[in-house]
Amino acid sequence: MAGSFAELARQADKSRDTMLVPKTALETPPLEIHTLGDEVLRQPARRIGKVNEQVRELARDMLRSMYTAKGIGLAAPQVGIHQQLLVIDLDLENAATPPLVLINPEITAASAGLDTYEEGCLSIPGVYLDVVRPTAIELSFRDEMGRPRKMKADGLMARCIQHEMDHLNGVLFVDRVTDQDGLQKELKEKGFERQDVRSVA
């Protein structure tokens, strides 16, 4: 698909190799991933002013924690850090493919066409429900070296970016679920409280 992760990775320049970390589970991840009900997930993230080695090391620790949890995306608020930073890797099987690091991302355009697809979240483990989102997006962001970038994405990449960007605004995917009966059932089965959902659907 256009804007696929493999295509984006091929277009990236070699400096992104600085973000490569082993795509394996650690016995103890460096960062704790907060779960639904933790108020930290509901606080909006702040823009990052200066992109430096501290920011890059945070991104690496987020990746290590994400790989340990077997996820494909993670936003800084999920680990209790209210900065506009997210990491994505849709190619977990290929150790040489660099992950995508988005700093201060902004969606500049979204398709009129919508798509329904099942989503899950490391902050709501075990819960999987359909969410409607734009099929394709355009966005601007800074990369891990602080350089301004623009990008087009569709399919799973577009969905993953939108899902992770929601976290920067204190929104979780369950807030966008329209099937309230299914939502109630899934949350109850996995030990979460319906009252912790803040519907925006």
Swiss-Prot record:
Give the matching SUPFAM superfamilies: Peptide deformylase
What biological-process GO terms show up in the record? co-translational protein modification; translation
- Superkingdom assignment: Bacteria
Record field: catalytic activity: N-terminal N-formyl-L-methionyl-[peptide] + H2O = N-terminal L-methionyl-[peptide] + formate
Write down the Gene3D superfamilies for this protein, in alphabetical order: Peptide deformylase (3.90.45.10)
Please name one Pfam family that this protein belongs to: Pep_deformylase
Keyword ATP-binding appears in the UniProt entry: no
Q: What is its EC number?
A: 3.5.1.88
Reported cofactor(s): Fe(2+)
Its family remark reads: Belongs to the polypeptide deformylase family.
Q: So what does this one do?
A: Removes the formyl group from the N-terminal Met of newly synthesized proteins. Requires at least a dipeptide for an efficient rate of reaction. N-terminal L-methionine is a prerequisite for activity but the enzyme has broad specificity at other positions.
Q: What is this protein called?
A: Peptide deformylase
Its gene name is: def
